[in-house]
């Protein structure tokens, strides 16, 4: 894609938010599958575990990567208002194996959750956060300094895995006045085992 920000009006967002609540939607239960912790902790295979929304644990024998970590109840700057989680994450932070790298795709609250990154930084001493251009300052303002900021097409190699930040069509914002002030994108992973992308 061109990487150009997708423009949509705030009125459309409000309309969608109102209409989705006013519809009489059928509710149903989900069966939650318990992760195979033995396989996760041994890390002898290529394993991807979906934790919830865009949070995935990717393991390839050499490295453990967590994408867009979100473990809290709301995707919002407020802990009492905003979009609420319907299902608990498939894993808790305390259940995670050692995490080498966390990738952040963009600054929206459902992809960059302050409490989640804070708890991860406290739990794992050597964790590295890979973030889009412009977000390092946010992390440092929260006391998290092991952060590497990447522009589109920037790459680095971590434990024999080539990680590249690639453009996608989206946008970024955490408030009313910071639209597209930080970059957004996807992460491409390539190593001797395989290649995949997290959008």
Label each PLM-derived region with a short phrase.
Residues 132-138, 151-153:
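Short, polar loop motifs at secondary-structure junctions
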Residues 80-131, 146:
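Active-site metal-binding motif and surrounding structural segment of the metallo-beta-lactamase
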Residues 44, 54, 125, 152, ...:
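Residue-level marker for the onset of beta-strands and adjacent loop->beta junctions
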Residues 111, 137-141:
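Phosphate- and divalent-cation-binding pockets in alpha/beta enzyme and binding domains
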Residues 90-98, 156-160, 178:
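Short amphipathic alpha-helix with an adjacent loop that forms part of the alpha/beta core around
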Residues 1-84, 89-95, 190-199:
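Metallo-beta-lactamase
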Residues 54, 59-61, 157-199:
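Catalytic core of the metallo-beta-lactamase
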Residues 58, 68, 106, 129, ...:
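Divalent metal-coordination and catalytic microenvironments
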């Amino acid at each position: 894609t061109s990487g150009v920000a997708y423009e949509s009006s705030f009125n459309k967002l409000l309309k969608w938010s109102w209409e989705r609540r006013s519809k009489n939607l059928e509710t149903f239960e989900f069966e939650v599958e318990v992760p195979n912790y033995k396989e996760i902790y041994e890390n002898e295979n290529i394993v991807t575990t979906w934790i919830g929304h865009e949070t995935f644990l990717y393991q390839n024998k050499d490295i453990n990567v967590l994408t867009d970590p979100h473990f809290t109840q709301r995707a919002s700057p407020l802990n009492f208002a905003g979009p609420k989680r319907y299902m608990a994450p498939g894993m808790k932070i305390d259940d995670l194996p050692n995490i080498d790298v966390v990738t952040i795709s963009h600054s929206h609250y459902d992809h960059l959750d302050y409490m989640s990154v804070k708890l991860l930084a406290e739990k794992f001493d050597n964790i590295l956060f890979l973030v889009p251009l412009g977000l390092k300052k946010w992390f440092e303002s929260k006391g998290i300094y092991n952060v590497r900021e990447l522009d589109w097409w920037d790459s680095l190699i971590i434990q024999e895995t080539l990680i590249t930040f690639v453009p996608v069509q989206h946008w970024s914002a955490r408030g009313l006045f910071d639209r597209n002030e930080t970059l957004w994108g996807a992460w491409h992973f390539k190593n001797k085992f395989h290649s995949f992308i997290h959008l």
